Design a protein with these regions (language model features):
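Extracytosolic ligand-binding ectodomains
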Residues: 2-16, 31-400
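Sec-dependent N-terminal signal peptides of Gram-positive bacterial secreted proteins and lipoproteins
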Residues: 16-22
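C-terminal segment of classical bacterial N-terminal signal peptides
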Residues: 22-30
Length: 400
């Protein structure tokens, strides 16, 4: 099956300010317990949910795509649920580290009409802000944060108010490594990290699985702000089959692949979900993995796709938008159920956390029925990753 989807997570670098952006649409009809809100909120009033994602900087394409699908979900689903919802946005540029995520979280904690958050979209932003949201009783449902230790392990970086609708890197890493071992028959792999949470977690999972299978590996650690990769390309062994390159900036994956070719190296780039952008990463023969299938092949999604395209003329269905629609659907359903339980009021924002945990969605946008894992990690049940190879025309073909 071929896919010509745009698979993004970051393109052009731009050093933008870390202030929370405010864009809105209005639609009419674990540990210690989270803190109570100061006052109940009437469900007949306009409630706010916040989309927290990179809208500027190198990963802006991620946020722009996610926001378009969250807007469409609010527009089409909120009236059916009898809700009046205003969608606001908070910008978390990946180049600026944890500060923007913390600033945005404090802003929305202070606004008592914000009853839920879609995001944060990146693992670093989740780690930086989840405690703040939890202490205020705010559920936050990410459509794309995959770092394993956000929800698993002895030192979890997120709280029980955090949920994600996509699988974690402990699924992505083994999936990527298994494909390299079983299908590509690799003998020598270079693994790179970019000294930030997303790449460190994914690189670690891949390297662990490759080593367990007896594959020769070497490791390079690159600052996330580096743009000239030539010294690192020089250090790629001539015998290397693959360079595993888990960036959040697909343009960097393209640059690295181009420099490999310029230096006569045979290795191909294999990116994680952060590299999925066919407009920026188009080096033929390279590979990417992603947590979303091509939803254009799911018959039940036809009307959703048609409606989204009508609202976004000329845009291509990508891999990051549909999970954002799904995360928004989960949040809206939880808000509706919390309102019902509170007899027309959200007595405390933490009621939405409890409601999120009980959500199931039939005819899920990514296929099948959505539900939470029974492992109490707030991860989705039965989720998987997909492998794509970049073709000579720049399209992404599903290969695993």
């Amino acid at each position: 099956m071929k896919s010509s989807m745009s698979f993004p997570r970051a393109t052009a670098l731009a050093g933008a300010a870390a202030l929370a952006g405010l864009a809105a649409i209005t639609v009419s009809p674990a540990t210690a317990a989270p803190a109570k809100s100061s006052a109940a909120v009437s469900c007949s009033s306009t409630l706010k949910i916040a989309m927290v994602t990179p809208l500027t900087g190198g990963a802006s394409f991620l946020g722009v795509e996610q926001l378009s699908w969250a807007k469409y979900a609010v527009k089409t689903l909120a009236p059916k649920l009898g809700l009046k919802i205003k969608l606001v946005t908070g910008d978390t540029p990946v180049e600026q580290g944890p500060a923007p995520a913390q600033t945005v979280a404090q802003k929305y904690v202070a606004d008592k009409t914000v009853v839920g958050v879609i995001g944060p979209s990146t693992s670093g932003a989740v780690a930086a802000s989840s405690k703040t949201y939890f202490q205020a009783g705010i559920a936050h449902v990410s459509p794309s944060a995959t770092r394993t230790t956000l929800t698993k392990g002895d030192n979890q970086e997120a709280t029980k108010a955090f949920f994600r609708v996509v699988p974690a890197d402990d699924i992505q890493g083994p999936t990527d490594a298994k494909y390299m071992i079983d299908t590509l028959k690799v003998k020598n792999v270079v693994v790179i990290d970019f000294q930030e949470p997303y790449s460190l977690g994914l690189a670690g999972e891949v390297e662990k699985n490759l080593k367990a299978a007896g594959v020769t590996t070497s490791h390079q650690s690159i600052d996330n702000k580096v743009t000239d990769f030539s010294p690192y390309v020089t250090n790629v062994p001539a015998a290397a089959d693959i360079v595993f390159f888990p960036t959040q900036k697909p343009g960097d994956a393209q640059a690295f692949a181009s420099q490999l070719a310029e230096q006569g190296k045979k290795a191909k780039v294999f990116g994680g979900d952060g590299s999925n952008d066919s407009s920026a990463f188009k080096a033929a023969g390279s590979y990417v993995s992603n947590f979303a299938p091509d939803i254009t092949g799911i018959p039940a999604d036809a009307s959703i796709i048609a409606g989204w395209k009508k609202d976004n003329p000329g845009k291509t269905v990508g891999s990051f938008g549909p999970p954002s629609y799904g995360a928004t659907q989960v949040m809206l359903t939880a808000i509706k159920n919390a309102c019902k339980a509170g007899k027309g009021k959200i007595v405390k924002r933490a009621a939405v956390i409890a409601a999120v945990r009980k959500v199931t969605i039939p005819n899920w946008i990514l296929g099948g029925t959505f539900s939470w894992s029974k492992t109490d990690t707030n991860d989705p049940a039965g989720a998987k990753f997909y492998i794509f190879q970049i073709q000579s025309d720049g399209t992404y073909k599903l290969v695993g």
